[in-house]
From Swiss-Prot:
Ribosomal protein recorded as keyword: yes
SUPFAM superfamilies: Ribosomal protein L32e
Annotated GO CC locations: cytosol; ribonucleoprotein complex; ribosome
Ribonucleoprotein in keyword set: yes
Keyword terms of this UniProt record: Ribonucleoprotein, Ribosomal protein
GO MF terms held by the record: structural constituent of ribosome
Gene Ontology biological process: translation
Highest taxon above the source species: Eukaryota
Protein family (similarity comment): Belongs to the eukaryotic ribosomal protein eL32 family.
Protein name: Putative large ribosomal subunit protein eL32'
InterPro entries: Ribosomal_eL32, Ribosomal_eL32_CS, Ribosomal_eL32_sf
Amino acid sequence: MAALRPLVKPKIVKKRTKKFIRHQSDRYVKIKWNWRKPRGIDNRVRRRFKGQILMPNIGYRSNKKTKHTLSSGFRKFLVHNIKEPEVLLMCNKSYRAEIAHNVSSKNRKAIVERAAQLAIRVTNPNTRLHSEENE
């Protein structure tokens, strides 16, 4: 099967790839890394002092045209059963199927086979497929 290319492949610009970490999470073990907005009256991060960690704001948002776009130029479409890849039949140059995490390995095989018949690419075709010798 020839490699499908996306209709348009815009340049994806990530304004920031590092995670935003919580203030003083590097200092204390009990404070997790997950971002929380600082709300203290004297907090240096909230007041945006020079040299402090950065806070997320609207300026870091992705471009609307390239948001949720894979590096290959396609977008993901979550598939839960064998009938859902047929939705992508007319737009297989802009979308790729991704099998949901809660689909059984038996149904995964069927979805991958059906997608191959319809010339639809799957982003995770080999996930949770067991070899024949293990069965």
